């Protein structure tokens, strides 16, 4: 499950070297490059040495998924997920938790992996950053596709080592976005033309919940589509329907900008100049495209 490509193996060795030299490490890797895979050798070495290891992740669902993957990889160790609904057991060999759950641990971890540090709730949150530092007595490994200026400054000053990986395991080039400058009414006309020709599943990103809901209703008489926002109750069911091709399109917000892989998916961003779509958000959105070996390219 965690077999590495040559590029991943090279990056993984660099991480191990920097950690052993006493540095915190920033892994700057493209969406879909396999950041979890890059952590396996550092995790293995730390766990084999009897050290306490933690992985902090922004979203509860990903905590549960990563905990399962880690338990399969480290069968003889106790891997404990700590998040909403899973707080009765908080101690083990490897702790996988949401960012906020780090408050439970004081100077506990010899190695702490911080995933998606460019995302809510960690991004720009000085309190969570302090909680994370307090939980770790050793080294911190930061994972992101969009490092902020603060981290890059630490790299330039030599206080943080950076390892880069911009190739996905399938070896194909990253998908580059196509940009069209149109007034909003013409954006909808252009979208309609795209939808009529579209043969693959598509995520259509809009800046607000209201627009997602309105466009979902507007286009539903013409296409198999739905809206998915933070207010949607049956999120997993809607995503499953898109994967099964029971739906062709989902109108959504930045809630689906990360943490979701749909083979063959294309993306469109309407009103991409809206403030909600910052650089990091747009990079994550285009990062949904071309992730699988069977469909390494696409439209975004």
Identify what each model region corresponds to.
Residues 116-119, 243-248, 254-296:
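Conserved RecA-like helicase motor core of SF1/SF2 enzymes
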Residues 29-36, 46, 51-66, 194-219:
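Conserved strand-helix element at the start of the C-terminal RecA-like helicase core
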Residues 107-111, 116-181, 185-186, 190:
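Post-DEXD/H (motif II) to motif III coupling segment of the RecA-like Helicase ATP-binding lobe
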Residues 48-52, 57-99, 225:
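Conserved nucleic-acid-binding Ia/Ib motif block in the N-terminal RecA-like helicase ATPase lobe
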Residues 2-23:
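N-terminal pre-P-loop "Q-motif" helix
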Residues 20-42:
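Walker A/P-loop
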Residues 80-89, 226-253:
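Conserved helicase ATPase core of P-loop NTP-dependent helicases/translocases
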Residues 137-150, 286-300:
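Conserved segment of the helicase C-terminal RecA-like domain
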């Amino acid at each position: 499950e965690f077999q590495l490509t040559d590029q991943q193996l090279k990056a993984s060795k660099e991480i191990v070297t920097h950690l052993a030299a006493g540095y915190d490490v920033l892994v700057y890797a493209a969406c879909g490059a396999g950041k979890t895979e890059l952590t396996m050798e550092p995790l293995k070495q730390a766990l084999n040495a009897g050290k306490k290891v933690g992985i902090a992740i922004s979203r509860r669902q990903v905590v549960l998924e990563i905990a399962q993957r880690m338990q399969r990889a480290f069968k003889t160790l106790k891997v404990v997920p700590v998040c909403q609904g899973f707080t009765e057991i908080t101690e083990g060999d490897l702790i996988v938790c949401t960012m906020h759950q780090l408050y439970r641990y004081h100077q506990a971890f010899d190695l702490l992996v911080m995933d998606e540090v460019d995302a809510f709730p960690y991004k720009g949150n000085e309190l969570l950053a302090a909680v994370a530092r307090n939980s770790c007595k050793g080294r911190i490994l930061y994972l992101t596709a969009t490092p902020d200026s603060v981290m890059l400054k630490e790299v330039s000053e030599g206080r943080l080592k950076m390892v880069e990986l911009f190739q996905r395991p399938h070896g194909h080039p990253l998908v580059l976005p196509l940009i069209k400058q149109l007034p909003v009414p013409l954006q909808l006309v252009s979208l309609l033309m795209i939808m009529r020709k579209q043969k693959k599943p598509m995520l259509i990103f809009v800046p607000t919940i209201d627009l997602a809901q309105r466009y979902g209703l507007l286009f539903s008489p013409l296409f198999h589509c739905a809206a998915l926002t933070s207010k949607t109750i049956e999120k997993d069911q809607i995503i499953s329907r898109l994967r099964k091709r029971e739906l062709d399109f989902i109108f959504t917000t930045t809630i689906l900008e990360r943490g979701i892989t749909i083979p063959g998916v294309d993306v469109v961003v309407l009103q991409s100049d809206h403030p909600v779509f910052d650089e990091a958000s747009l990079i994550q959105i285009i990062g949904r495209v071309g992730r699988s070996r069977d469909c390494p390219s696409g439209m975004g």
